[in-house]
Amino acid sequence: MENIDFATLFQGIGTMMASGWVLASARVFLVLLGLLLIYLGWKGILEPMVMIPMGLGMVAINCGTLIMPDGTLGNLFLDPMLSDTDQLMNTMQIDFLQPVYTLTFSNGLIACFVFMGIGTLLDVGFLLQKPFASIFLALCAELGTFLTVPIASALGLTLKESASVAMVGGADGPMVLFTSLALAKHLFVPITVVAYLYLGLTYGGYPYLVKLLVPKRFRAIKMVTKKAPKNYDAKVKLAFSAVLCAILCFLFPVASPLFFSLFLGVAVRESGMKHIYDFVSGPLLYGSTFMLGVLLGVLCDAHLLLDPDRKSVV
């Protein structure tokens, strides 16, 4: 009877032993982190629609590493670093998530779908009533972006790479995804993964950060509304959205797909297209967000994240 090579029979274990202690430790850490994300999503501490599929994807991708025919380590989920057309077409017939990643994630389509869904939930009435207050709040939200650029540059990243990393500070996942594709495509995977981990952990830790940073006497202040918000007619909101979309696309063409998607969602909301509204605000938004979590999870491959060219981002 021939001896059974368990390392070959169970390749997940075999690749763990053959990959070196650094990579093996990273795989174990990411598996444990994935399990933690699943638990925190189940408890409702983090957003379950993103964190549960993301955590399960992290577990599966780091446990399911195998030895490919050419002797390298790989998986049967996807390869985000493919650029050759022939290799990409061959891989799309083998790796089951490669078509989803290539046709929706790496070209920004899934980000546009999410923005479209967000648009259906967005009431532009406050922006109409208080445009300057809205701009001020937006600038405050982007403070982290401006502060991160010089720090990233000091770590050796180029200006475009620094700008892509800095977008994480704006706490806008789809915008991070879209910007990294435009400015630093070679860092797209680690930037996107770090961004959504940061957003999820910030969401879960936000109440504790508020208690830590804001004195109790300020937290006890009750907000008083001096006057009731003005109710704008739907046609005013629709016209405002169309004009604002045109202006923003004219000023910032590189982000025009996101602007179009957002204001298309607003237009659906304000025009009374009930069936389209139900679809965009429901299945499209939640389905895209769920698949975003799945793809983010399987992109958390230890071998990919520990690449020397991407360590500085992580």
PLM features per residue range, with description:
Residues 1-82, 92:
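N-terminal alpha-helical transmembrane segments of multi-pass membrane transport
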Residues 55-62, 136-149, 169-176, 285-299:
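Small-residue-rich segments of transmembrane alpha-helices in multi-pass membrane proteins
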Residues 63-98, 119-128, 150-159, 303-304:
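Transmembrane alpha-helix boundary signature
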Residues 312-313:
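Conserved small/polar residues in nucleotide/adenosyl-binding loops
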